[in-house]
């Protein structure tokens, strides 16, 4: 038993060495007996540290402790007395001999790791000064606060372009980009880090599937994609960054075992720091958008999981939603093409309805114009504008179908105070064909913050949930009753046209390119709150994300740089194609005067004609010279025919003997 060392790796109290070692190292025994509790605590603490890191006790303690000169001499003397076969036991080094500046992995201040502690190392694929944004609230954290998990999205809202299949195939797909941020305050044993992107849909069927069936809903998985960021079996599993794209490590780092040891143990030790794992995924435009209907929904979310090693260590799970918004294709004219309806009613009234577009977002103001031309004695008592919403649901591969009752939301209404005497036309009902009336409305669509009975759902493209809208105008008219002049005949005219309602997040600054004259790039920021909420509440600076890409605040508030004349709303009948940012009326600037007048074509024609005549004379002289040379060479002289420049006789070739 000479030199035998017995240090249990997981012992609660250290029985440090055997009796034979005490006999051979008397000096060390005397020092140890002077303070047995100190030795016992140091041995047990180091042994537990060895069991965590999977290292021999001698190698680890020599790196963590700084023994004094007397202890080194005593160890050398003991080794020389035993013939050099017994190595000194560094685990017996007292705690008082350790350096005054221990590593941060042992420091209690590491619990406040991301408060005032200093980052001493940054490890990444590309070393740069880019630091991940500060996360306001973690999605998941451990019980003691030693580990937290967060998901940062570069674009919190993704826009899918196109409502038709052809438009979806032409446009580029949306790109989901972000980072998973893992913060570790003290060394932790981790078995795996993964992230999944999932899209699910559900339709509610209270009457059962089929009718009086047991199933009252149907769930479907639209997409499921997984990322494996870290596994113990991966290459370089025990590297300092553990597969992270950017790793910000805190304190002095200890050398860790090889990847083979991590694969055998089934976990790796993550040093204190912040680990960032980037991810991206292309989402085709043919995918359904996020929907929250009355009897169904479509939702997308990212779910991160951190598997921890240990008996009483629970896994960290965090989930964050991802919104997919459907927008018209940039090549589509639905937002700029006008709706014009022109009809005649019983040869008594000619009316026109004009709407400045075919697609509008929730909360947007829609200009609507009515024009009337009186052909007879007609009175108008009521004029109302509303939106009618129809919803349809399918399930079991579209075998079962349900149509919900239509919902009508009133937008604007104008009526006469006294139905018998008043008239909205405000003109005597002469019916001479010359009197007319025009009504302009600025109708505001309801936002997503209104009451449930007045709330609208935007149009959907999902094949199991269909929501459509129609704009409806109601006219209440009256004419004279020839049979009873004291009473009038009343009629109702319904005007309907399909319109497309978009999500409230389809603001111009998010779906269109920014103006070229904007020089400041830092002002365009993505705001997580809904634009409907921005119009009613004040947005705090903390709600603005750290990534600057787009803006929705500019669409909800008038621009301060534009003149007051540009902010005045124009009637819809004054322009054919409405602009998203029209200039003021006096904003047109005349082009500069042209300082180069056109040339004098008479002189130019004379010069060109003289040049053409000289060219003809030169060509004729050249032909005569060639002909004389050929005649002299043959030896025969023939009488040449006179030149006829304007004759149409058939030319004959000269007979030259050969």
Curated annotation (Swiss-Prot):
Keywords: Cytoplasm, Phosphoprotein. May regulate endocytosis in response to extracellular stimuli. It comes from the Eukaryota. This is Putative arrestin-related trafficking adapter C2D10.04. It comes from Schizosaccharomyces pombe (strain 972 / ATCC 24843) (Fission yeast). GO terms for biological process: clathrin-dependent endocytosis; ubiquitin-dependent endocytosis. GO terms for cellular component: cell division site; cell tip; cytoplasm; cytosol. Residues 96-107 have a biased composition (Polar residues). It is found in: Cytoplasm. Pfam families: Arrestin_C, Arrestin_N.
